[in-house]
Regions:
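Flavin-dependent oxidoreductase catalytic cores
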Residues: 1-105
């Protein structure tokens, strides 16, 4: 049986200066398909909140277009006008309520 943990700091908090992560576990970006339709944002919020509650320190969203030219397909998820802010706020609020951190890709 191991008496030494190979990654002793993995579950320790990490102070980034502007925020502190509860641990060093990062969930990399993956495209779920939920970010492509505004009707699915409540499901996307629940998806990320569940992982935040499950002790993931930082999650990275699937690709979110920063502008129309950055779109990979017609009518993608984006954050390039004020009308798109509320649906993204739904996700960040759910994650923060579960004591998580999230970063948009």
């Amino acid at each position: 049986m191991y008496t030494v943990t190979p990654f002793p700091h993995m579950l320790a908090p990490l102070d980034l200066g502007f925020t502190t992560m509860k641990n060093r576990v990062l969930m990399g970006s993956m495209h779920t398909g939920l970010e492509d339709h505004k009707k699915d944002f409540p499901r996307l919020a629940a998806y990320f909140a569940e992982r935040a509650a499950g002790e993931v320190g930082l999650m990275v969203t699937g690709g979110i277009a920063p502008g129309v030219r950055g779109s990979l397909m017609p009518f993608p998820s984006g954050l390039f006008n004020r009308l798109q802010v509320p649906r993204h706020k739904l996700v960040t609020t759910a994650v923060h309520e579960a004591d998580g951190k999230i970063c948009m890709q």
